[in-house]
């Protein structure tokens, strides 16, 4: 009986710690209002460039354009990366 109680309490403690860590991570990833988004713009431009160059290279090789999968919630569409 003691072992079961200890196991339940341990699981509850782990769940609480995991939830707290997830909330802290989410809060750290949120942007503050009024914060300049120059870093985001640079990432957007980089993905746009990578995606369009990848498709152009494949087109010049007389192959169908197999669109490169963009990462981080982006998708290659019409030779540009678009947010999904």
Curated annotation (Swiss-Prot):
Lineage: superkingdom: Eukaryota
PROSITE patterns: HWTX_2
GO molecular function: toxin activity
This protein's UniProt keywords: Disulfide bond, Neurotoxin, Postsynaptic neurotoxin, Secreted, Signal, Toxin
InterPro entries: Hwtx-2-like
Predominant cellular place of this UniProt entry's protein: secreted
Signal peptide: 1-22
SUPFAM superfamilies associated with the record: omega toxin-like
GO cellular component: extracellular region; host cell postsynaptic membrane
Covalent S-S links between cysteines: 51-65, 55-76, 70-81
Purpose of the protein: Postsynaptic neurotoxin.
Family: Belongs to the neurotoxin 12 (Hwtx-2) family. 02 (Hwtx-2) subfamily.
Name of this chain's protein: U4-theraphotoxin-Hhn1ac
Provenance organism: Cyriopagopus hainanus (Chinese bird spider)
């Amino acid at each position: 009986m003691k072992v079961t109680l200890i196991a339940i309490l341990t699981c509850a403690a782990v769940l609480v710690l995991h939830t707290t860590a997830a909330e802290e991570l989410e809060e750290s990833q949120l942007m503050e209002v009024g914060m300049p988004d120059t870093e985001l713009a640079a990432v957007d431009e980089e993905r746009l460039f990578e995606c369009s160059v990848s498709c152009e290279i494949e087109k010049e090789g007389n192959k169908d354009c197999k669109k490169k999968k963009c990462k981080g919630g982006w998708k290659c569409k019409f030779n540009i990366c678009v947010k999904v």
